Amino acid sequence: MPSIETQSTSPPPLRIPHREASAHKGNFGRVLLIGGSRGMAGSIALSSIAALHTGSGLVAAAVPDCILDCVAGFHPALMTIGLGDDGEKFADPAWQSLKDRLSAQAAIGCGPGMTTGSGGATIVEGLLAKKDLPLVLDADALNIIAQNDWLSDGRFERSKADAACVLTPHPGELQRLTGASAKDVDAQVEAAAELACRLGLTIVVKGGPSHVAYQNGDGGKQVWQNTTGNPGMATAGCGDVLTGIVTSLLGQGLSGPDAAKLGVWIHGRCGDEAAARWSHAGMTSLHALDALALVADEMTQPAD
């Protein structure tokens, strides 16, 4: 096992960047969340709204046309981009409509609710080639990568000159990516650390507790262990909220490891606030999302 850096229950030393009085929305990152399908509109909506509440100045959701109106109705500040679909999910031409919009983004998150069809696969494949854009990959984006064995063909490798790439798998997704059993936490953390170090990625190993694996400054394996969060967060949509938080932090200029560590800590703190009010059994991802704005404010860098 690599050495594990354990964060105490006090707030981590990382902070969301301070907001100057003269700032405008363009100073806080334009981010794009990509995903959703018929029956899974809530996933991409949760991610996108989480990015708004974490402080992103502008957030857009790129979704199949068939769910555009549904996703747009979740929040009036959320911009939406409709892409070609087959009536259920992204169709193959969706990437051609999307790719010219990417250069304006400070960070991109992809995967929540997307399904693993060929249209989604074309989008993920295109994003992997854009190594100048900070990227978060979650959910079905990870399943697509596992199905196509894209971790082993070189397209994932990141140098220090490339933008950050953060993966946020749950245990089942990590098993599909690495072969490490979802029932063996130590094996999963070790596999994530090896993969992160080999390819220059940051990997969030979601669980109780969650870990963040990344390459340290000496090129070795580093693992950080979080201490916020609770079993009530094992509920639909909580992972989607994390995707939005980490994407927002990347868009505000944090590095991959810092965005992942601070994002996981904030996410768990939101879950703790929700559980205190609604109970472990009764809380939902919406309750965690409701706590996010105040928790993010607490974690913002104060003025000098």
UniProtKB/Swiss-Prot annotation:
CDD domains: YXKO-related (cd01171). Residues 8-299 form the YjeF C-terminal domain. Its cofactor is Mg(2+). (6S)-NADPHX binds at residues 113, 170, 240. GO terms for molecular function: ADP-dependent NAD(P)H-hydrate dehydratase activity; ATP binding; NAD(P)HX epimerase activity. Residues 1-21 are annotated as: Disordered. InterPro entries: Carbohydrate_kinase_pred_CS, CARKD, Ribokinase-like. SUPFAM superfamilies: Ribokinase-like. Its EC number is 4.2.1.136. AMP binds at residue 239. It catalyses: (6S)-NADHX + ADP = AMP + phosphate + NADH + H(+); (6S)-NADPHX + ADP = AMP + phosphate + NADPH + H(+). GO terms for biological process: metabolite repair; nicotinamide nucleotide metabolic process. Keywords: ATP-binding, Lyase, NAD, NADP, Nucleotide-binding. Catalyzes the dehydration of the S-form of NAD(P)HX at the expense of ADP, which is converted to AMP. Together with NAD(P)HX epimerase, which catalyzes the epimerization of the S- and R-forms, the enzyme allows the repair of both epimers of NAD(P)HX, a damaged form of NAD(P)H that is a result of enzymatic or heat-dependent hydration. Belongs to the NnrD/CARKD family. Homotetramer. This is ADP-dependent (S)-NAD(P)H-hydrate dehydratase. It comes from Rhodopirellula baltica (strain DSM 10527 / NCIMB 13988 / SH1). The gene is nnrD.
